[in-house]
UniProtKB/Swiss-Prot annotation:
Keywords: Acyltransferase, Amino-acid biosynthesis, Diaminopimelate biosynthesis, Lysine biosynthesis, Repeat, Transferase. This is 2,3,4,5-tetrahydropyridine-2,6-dicarboxylate N-acetyltransferase. Belongs to the transferase hexapeptide repeat family. DapH subfamily. It catalyses: (S)-2,3,4,5-tetrahydrodipicolinate + acetyl-CoA + H2O = L-2-acetamido-6-oxoheptanedioate + CoA. GO terms for molecular function: tetrahydrodipicolinate N-acetyltransferase activity. It holds the Pfam family DapH_N.
Length: 236
Protein backbone atom coordinates (compact mmCIF):
# COMPACT_ATOMS: atom_id res chain seq x y z
CA UNK A 1 0.00 0.00 0.00
CA UNK A 2 1.41 3.38 -1.01
CA UNK A 3 0.50 6.76 0.44
CA UNK A 4 1.01 10.33 -0.70
CA UNK A 5 2.41 11.81 2.48
CA UNK A 6 2.19 15.35 1.08
CA UNK A 7 -1.61 15.15 1.44
CA UNK A 8 -3.03 15.51 4.98
CA UNK A 9 -5.89 13.14 4.18
CA UNK A 10 -3.42 10.54 2.92
CA UNK A 11 -1.37 10.91 6.11
CA UNK A 12 -4.55 10.38 8.12
CA UNK A 13 -5.35 7.28 6.04
CA UNK A 14 -1.83 5.99 6.58
CA UNK A 15 -2.25 6.36 10.35
CA UNK A 16 -5.72 4.77 10.24
CA UNK A 17 -4.57 1.73 8.25
CA UNK A 18 -1.24 1.23 10.02
CA UNK A 19 -1.02 -1.79 12.28
CA UNK A 20 -1.20 -0.43 15.81
CA UNK A 21 1.56 -1.51 18.15
CA UNK A 22 1.87 -1.78 21.93
CA UNK A 23 5.43 -3.03 22.42
CA UNK A 24 6.63 -3.88 25.91
CA UNK A 25 9.77 -5.10 27.63
CA UNK A 26 9.40 -7.78 30.29
CA UNK A 27 12.07 -8.74 32.81
CA UNK A 28 11.20 -12.14 34.25
CA UNK A 29 12.71 -14.50 36.80
CA UNK A 30 11.20 -17.94 36.42
CA UNK A 31 11.17 -21.31 34.67
CA UNK A 32 10.08 -20.58 31.10
CA UNK A 33 12.19 -23.08 29.15
CA UNK A 34 9.12 -24.79 27.65
CA UNK A 35 7.42 -21.62 26.45
CA UNK A 36 6.80 -20.75 22.81
CA UNK A 37 8.60 -17.47 22.11
CA UNK A 38 7.57 -17.17 18.45
CA UNK A 39 7.41 -13.48 17.42
CA UNK A 40 9.10 -12.48 20.69
CA UNK A 41 12.72 -11.39 20.99
CA UNK A 42 14.20 -13.30 23.94
CA UNK A 43 17.41 -13.00 25.92
CA UNK A 44 17.97 -15.31 28.84
CA UNK A 45 20.51 -16.82 31.17
CA UNK A 46 19.20 -19.61 33.36
CA UNK A 47 15.91 -18.46 34.88
CA UNK A 48 16.41 -14.79 33.97
CA UNK A 49 14.58 -13.61 30.83
CA UNK A 50 14.30 -10.33 28.97
CA UNK A 51 11.49 -10.30 26.43
CA UNK A 52 10.72 -7.72 23.73
CA UNK A 53 7.47 -7.93 21.79
CA UNK A 54 3.81 -7.03 21.52
CA UNK A 55 1.95 -6.80 24.81
CA UNK A 56 -0.77 -9.33 23.96
CA UNK A 57 1.79 -12.03 23.18
CA UNK A 58 4.06 -11.48 26.18
CA UNK A 59 1.17 -11.08 28.62
CA UNK A 60 -0.26 -14.44 27.50
CA UNK A 61 3.05 -16.12 28.39
CA UNK A 62 3.12 -14.40 31.77
CA UNK A 63 -0.47 -15.39 32.56
CA UNK A 64 -0.04 -19.02 31.50
CA UNK A 65 3.16 -19.40 33.53
CA UNK A 66 2.40 -17.24 36.55
CA UNK A 67 2.94 -20.17 38.91
CA UNK A 68 6.49 -20.56 37.56
CA UNK A 69 7.40 -16.88 37.76
CA UNK A 70 9.12 -15.48 40.86
CA UNK A 71 9.51 -11.87 39.76
CA UNK A 72 8.32 -9.85 36.80
CA UNK A 73 8.67 -6.23 35.72
CA UNK A 74 7.10 -4.72 32.60
CA UNK A 75 8.12 -1.49 30.85
CA UNK A 76 5.83 0.24 28.36
CA UNK A 77 6.15 3.62 26.63
CA UNK A 78 3.24 3.64 24.15
CA UNK A 79 -0.16 2.12 23.46
CA UNK A 80 -1.70 1.33 20.07
CA UNK A 81 0.95 3.44 18.39
CA UNK A 82 0.47 3.89 14.64
CA UNK A 83 3.81 5.35 13.58
CA UNK A 84 7.19 4.11 14.79
CA UNK A 85 9.93 6.45 15.88
CA UNK A 86 12.68 7.46 13.48
CA UNK A 87 15.76 5.22 13.29
CA UNK A 88 18.42 7.74 14.32
CA UNK A 89 21.53 5.55 14.14
CA UNK A 90 22.70 6.76 10.72
CA UNK A 91 21.70 10.42 11.06
CA UNK A 92 24.58 12.89 11.18
CA UNK A 93 23.01 15.29 13.68
CA UNK A 94 23.02 15.93 17.42
CA UNK A 95 19.83 14.52 18.92
CA UNK A 96 19.54 14.85 22.69
CA UNK A 97 17.70 12.45 25.05
CA UNK A 98 13.97 12.96 25.29
CA UNK A 99 13.47 14.22 21.74
CA UNK A 100 10.56 12.47 20.01
CA UNK A 101 10.93 12.13 16.25
CA UNK A 102 8.44 10.06 14.28
CA UNK A 103 9.28 7.99 11.24
CA UNK A 104 9.37 9.57 7.75
CA UNK A 105 11.05 12.73 9.02
CA UNK A 106 14.11 14.21 7.28
CA UNK A 107 16.89 15.46 9.57
CA UNK A 108 19.60 17.52 7.85
CA UNK A 109 23.35 17.31 8.40
CA UNK A 110 24.69 18.89 11.59
CA UNK A 111 21.27 19.90 12.84
CA UNK A 112 20.51 19.90 16.58
CA UNK A 113 17.38 18.47 18.17
CA UNK A 114 17.20 19.33 21.85
CA UNK A 115 15.58 17.63 24.85
CA UNK A 116 11.80 17.41 24.70
CA UNK A 117 11.49 18.51 21.07
CA UNK A 118 8.70 16.81 19.10
CA UNK A 119 8.87 16.37 15.33
CA UNK A 120 5.89 14.81 13.58
CA UNK A 121 5.56 12.67 10.46
CA UNK A 122 6.70 14.19 7.16
CA UNK A 123 8.55 17.13 8.70
CA UNK A 124 11.85 18.31 7.24
CA UNK A 125 14.66 19.82 9.31
CA UNK A 126 17.33 21.58 7.27
CA UNK A 127 21.10 21.42 7.56
CA UNK A 128 22.48 23.22 10.61
CA UNK A 129 19.05 23.95 12.07
CA UNK A 130 18.35 23.81 15.81
CA UNK A 131 15.01 22.71 17.25
CA UNK A 132 15.29 23.86 20.84
CA UNK A 133 13.87 22.36 24.03
CA UNK A 134 10.14 21.50 23.98
CA UNK A 135 9.64 22.98 20.52
CA UNK A 136 7.14 21.29 18.20
CA UNK A 137 7.32 20.80 14.45
CA UNK A 138 3.96 19.53 13.23
CA UNK A 139 3.29 17.12 10.39
CA UNK A 140 5.05 18.19 7.17
CA UNK A 141 6.48 21.33 8.74
CA UNK A 142 9.50 22.44 6.71
CA UNK A 143 12.47 24.17 8.32
CA UNK A 144 15.25 25.39 6.04
CA UNK A 145 18.99 25.61 6.68
CA UNK A 146 20.44 27.33 9.75
CA UNK A 147 17.07 28.00 11.34
CA UNK A 148 16.71 28.41 15.11
CA UNK A 149 13.33 27.29 16.45
CA UNK A 150 13.25 28.58 20.01
CA UNK A 151 12.29 26.69 23.14
CA UNK A 152 8.57 25.95 23.34
CA UNK A 153 7.86 27.34 19.87
CA UNK A 154 5.30 25.63 17.63
CA UNK A 155 5.33 25.20 13.86
CA UNK A 156 1.81 23.95 13.13
CA UNK A 157 1.21 20.77 11.16
CA UNK A 158 -1.17 19.92 8.34
CA UNK A 159 -3.20 17.18 10.00
CA UNK A 160 -5.81 18.67 12.31
CA UNK A 161 -7.32 20.86 11.07
CA UNK A 162 -6.26 19.52 7.65
CA UNK A 163 -4.26 21.93 5.51
CA UNK A 164 -2.90 21.34 2.02
CA UNK A 165 0.00 23.75 2.53
CA UNK A 166 2.63 23.01 5.18
CA UNK A 167 4.33 25.65 7.28
CA UNK A 168 7.54 26.67 5.55
CA UNK A 169 10.38 28.31 7.45
CA UNK A 170 13.04 29.42 4.99
CA UNK A 171 16.82 29.55 5.56
CA UNK A 172 18.43 31.63 8.33
CA UNK A 173 15.20 32.38 10.19
CA UNK A 174 15.17 32.80 13.97
CA UNK A 175 11.94 32.04 15.82
CA UNK A 176 11.89 33.09 19.46
CA UNK A 177 10.77 31.03 22.43
CA UNK A 178 7.05 30.15 22.65
CA UNK A 179 6.19 31.69 19.28
CA UNK A 180 3.44 29.98 17.28
CA UNK A 181 3.44 29.71 13.49
CA UNK A 182 -0.07 28.82 12.33
CA UNK A 183 -1.03 26.34 9.59
CA UNK A 184 0.28 27.01 6.09
CA UNK A 185 2.31 30.11 6.99
CA UNK A 186 5.59 30.92 5.22
CA UNK A 187 8.43 32.78 6.95
CA UNK A 188 10.84 34.35 4.45
CA UNK A 189 14.62 34.02 4.50
CA UNK A 190 16.55 35.83 7.19
CA UNK A 191 13.52 37.01 9.15
CA UNK A 192 13.12 37.08 12.93
CA UNK A 193 9.97 36.17 14.86
CA UNK A 194 9.99 37.63 18.36
CA UNK A 195 9.39 35.42 21.38
CA UNK A 196 5.73 34.78 22.16
CA UNK A 197 4.47 35.98 18.78
CA UNK A 198 1.53 34.38 17.01
CA UNK A 199 2.11 34.45 13.26
CA UNK A 200 -1.15 34.36 11.27
CA UNK A 201 0.03 35.67 7.87
CA UNK A 202 3.06 35.09 5.67
CA UNK A 203 6.22 36.97 6.62
CA UNK A 204 8.50 38.43 3.91
CA UNK A 205 12.28 38.10 3.88
CA UNK A 206 14.59 39.99 6.25
CA UNK A 207 12.05 41.56 8.58
CA UNK A 208 11.35 41.37 12.32
CA UNK A 209 7.79 40.54 13.40
CA UNK A 210 6.33 40.62 16.90
CA UNK A 211 3.01 40.49 18.69
CA UNK A 212 -0.25 38.56 18.63
CA UNK A 213 -1.06 38.64 15.82
CA UNK A 214 2.49 39.27 14.67
CA UNK A 215 3.18 42.44 12.70
CA UNK A 216 6.30 43.76 10.99
CA UNK A 217 8.11 46.15 13.33
CA UNK A 218 11.29 46.75 11.33
CA UNK A 219 13.70 45.35 8.80
CA UNK A 220 16.57 43.15 9.92
CA UNK A 221 19.59 45.39 10.46
CA UNK A 222 23.17 44.92 11.64
CA UNK A 223 22.15 45.16 15.30
CA UNK A 224 19.44 42.52 14.82
CA UNK A 225 21.84 40.17 13.07
CA UNK A 226 24.34 40.56 15.90
CA UNK A 227 21.70 39.79 18.55
CA UNK A 228 20.34 36.75 16.71
CA UNK A 229 23.49 35.14 15.30
CA UNK A 230 23.89 31.38 15.61
CA UNK A 231 26.85 29.60 17.21
CA UNK A 232 28.53 27.17 14.85
CA UNK A 233 30.19 25.35 17.76
CA UNK A 234 26.77 24.07 18.87
CA UNK A 235 26.38 22.28 15.55
CA UNK A 236 29.68 20.39 15.54
Amino acid sequence: MSYNLTDPYEIARYIKEAKKSTPIKAYIEGELSNCDFTNIEKFNSGDLYILFGESEEILVIIEKNKDKIKNCRIEQDRRKSAIPLLDMLKINARIEPGAIIRDKVIIGENSVIMMGAVINIGAEIGEGTMVDMNAVVGARGKLGKNVHLGAGAVVAGVLEPPSSDPCTIEDNVLIGANAVILEGIKIGKGSVVAAGSIVTTDVPENVVVAGAPAKIIKEVDVKTKDKTKLLDDLRK
